[in-house]
Amino acid sequence: MASWKYPQLDVDELKIAKAVIRDVPESIRDLYNVCKAIRGMYLNDAKDFLNRVLEEKEALPFWRYNKGASHKSNISAKWKIKAGRYPKKAIRQVLKVLENAEANATNKGLDVDKLIIRHIAAHKGITLQRYMPRAFGRATAKYRRTSNIEVILEEVE
């Protein structure tokens, strides 16, 4: 496996909690927009927002990879963008890594109500190549793309 490190942040190690999930079977395109939307939010606010998107009460704005994304009327005006979607599979994976980071924070003795998402990012993971049989003895390559999600929570006063 390739070497990998968390980004270096100028914060006290006793005030942060980290979590990572690797080789998630999810597209980097959806994860990028989910991570961008919740970066800098309080942990509880981010989880509430993601649950509202899962219930399709609010759309997630798509800044990048938004070709074909229609304008949604239930996007908040604070995003200053109209294109949005409901990437449910990506949100479930991000909620999973947020729960893991929250458990790490409580294990460290940090106050959960004061946690903000200091860093969250999705990176490309491994790509699995498979073959789909076709007519006349041919085969077509199929690619299964994966992603890695990393999160750092910081306790603020």
Swiss-Prot record:
<comment type="subunit">
    <text>Part of the 50S ribosomal subunit.</text>
</comment>
<dbReference type="GO" id="GO:0019843">
    <property type="term" value="F:rRNA binding"/>
</dbReference>
<dbReference type="InterPro" id="IPR005721">
    <property type="entry name" value="Ribosomal_uL22_euk/arc"/>
</dbReference>
<dbReference type="Pfam" id="PF00237">
    <property type="entry name" value="Ribosomal_L22"/>
</dbReference>
<keyword id="KW-0694">RNA-binding</keyword>
<keyword id="KW-0687">Ribonucleoprotein</keyword>
<protein>
    <recommendedName>
        <fullName>Large ribosomal subunit protein uL22</fullName>
    </recommendedName>
</protein>
<dbReference type="InterPro" id="IPR036394">
    <property type="entry name" value="Ribosomal_uL22_sf"/>
</dbReference>
<dbReference type="GO" id="GO:0002181">
    <property type="term" value="P:cytoplasmic translation"/>
</dbReference>
<comment type="function">
    <text>This protein binds specifically to 23S rRNA. It makes multiple contacts with different domains of the 23S rRNA in the assembled 50S subunit and ribosome.</text>
</comment>
<dbReference type="GO" id="GO:0022625">
    <property type="term" value="C:cytosolic large ribosomal subunit"/>
</dbReference>
<dbReference type="GO" id="GO:0003735">
    <property type="term" value="F:structural constituent of ribosome"/>
</dbReference>
<comment type="similarity">
    <text>Belongs to the universal ribosomal protein uL22 family.</text>
</comment>
<keyword id="KW-0689">Ribosomal protein</keyword>
<dbReference type="InterPro" id="IPR001063">
    <property type="entry name" value="Ribosomal_uL22"/>
</dbReference>
<comment type="function">
    <text>The globular domain of the protein is located near the polypeptide exit tunnel on the outside of the subunit, while an extended beta-hairpin is found that lines the wall of the exit tunnel in the center of the 70S ribosome.</text>
</comment>
<keyword id="KW-0699">rRNA-binding</keyword>
<dbReference type="InterPro" id="IPR018260">
    <property type="entry name" value="Ribosomal_uL22_CS"/>
</dbReference>
